[in-house]
């Protein structure tokens, strides 16, 4: 049985129960002194960069559409408990349309213009796309006009013509959107900065096990319409964010762990 680490004494947490053990993190549900549940998350040191950016993102959000960061020590984070009900449950129980409307409403809150300055630690979206740009250069040098080349051109144009940069969650999908005592919140941000349209891109490819949805042109159009209204973005720019799919493919082709935006 895996024993939890020694949690910082000033957190005053008790009754740890391991609820997730993945390649990327260990997660315990704990109790705060008043009995309120909370989460302690441990990230491997080699994977700490994304987590630190994500922590800065949560501090910046200060509970607005996202779980609250209650404390952090090295690679340990103490987080607000977000419940157990995910947006994927809404898809299964009430249908994809309702889930999309929930996601759109949450993104409108999450990606609204903020008077708070963006954290300097957030990763520029262009840096996140480095693998796609490299794959496109390799294909062009080989004389091949591939989907990677086309997607890289679109991504570069979107980044170069971005009207306003926003703080982005960086890994928004149906299992990172949770129904808590405060309503729908996001968990596990990566922490990026870029055009708001990129913040919705991953949703078109999710749920990951539902190709019947992800490949349905009517669903894609409905999502683009819902997200464009929520984010006040031209739906064509949202659809151009399909470049994310080629980025994910480039990561997988290079044998890297899949990321998201």
State each model region's role:
Residues 179-225, 229-232:
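Active-site Asp-x-Gly
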Residues 1-16, 54, 141-149, 219, ...:
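Regulatory N- and C-terminal appendages and interdomain linkers associated
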Residues 1-66, 180-183:
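Conserved NTP-binding catalytic cores of kinases and kinase-like/nucleotidyltransferase enzymes
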Residues 26-32, 39, 69, 153-198:
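Active-site acidic catalytic loop and adjacent metal/ATP-binding pocket
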Residues 45, 76-96, 112-116, 130-141, ...:
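A glycine-centered beta->alpha junction motif in the catalytic cores
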Residues 2-7, 115-170, 180, 229:
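An alpha-helical support segment within catalytic cores of ATP-dependent transferases
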Residues 36-80, 85-110:
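A conserved alpha-helical element in kinase catalytic cores
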């Amino acid at each position: 049985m895996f024993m939890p680490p020694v949690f910082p004494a000033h957190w005053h947490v008790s009754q740890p129960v391991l609820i997730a053990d993945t390649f990327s993190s260990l997660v315990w549900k704990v109790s705060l002194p008043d009995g309120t549940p909370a989460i302690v998350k441990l990230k491997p040191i080699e994977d700490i960069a994304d987590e630190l950016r994500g922590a800065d993102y949560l501090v910046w959000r200060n509970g607005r559409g996202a779980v609250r960061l209650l404390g952090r020590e090295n690679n340990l984070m103490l987080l607000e408990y977000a419940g157990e009900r995910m947006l994927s449950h809404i898809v299964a129980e009430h249908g994809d349309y309702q889930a999309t409307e929930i996601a759109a409403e949450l993104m409108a809150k999450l990606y609204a213009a903020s008077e708070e300055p963006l954290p300097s630690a957030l990763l520029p979206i262009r840096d996140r796309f480095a693998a796609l740009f490299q794959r496109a250069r390799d294909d062009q040098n080989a004389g091949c006009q591939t989907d990677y080349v086309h997607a890289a051109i679109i991504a570069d144009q979107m980044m170069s013509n971005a009207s306003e940069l926003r703080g982005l969650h960086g890994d928004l999908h149906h299992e990172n959107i949770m129904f808590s005592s405060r309503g729908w919140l996001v968990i596990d941000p990566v922490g990026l900065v870029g055009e708001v349209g990129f913040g919705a891109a991953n949703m078109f490819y999710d749920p990951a096990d539902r190709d019947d949805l992800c490949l349905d042109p009517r669903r894609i159009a409905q999502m683009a319409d819902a997200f464009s209204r929520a984010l006040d973005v031209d739906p064509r720019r949202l659809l151009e964010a399909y470049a994310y799919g080629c980025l994910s493919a480039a990561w997988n082709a290079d044998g890297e762990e899949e990321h998201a935006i």
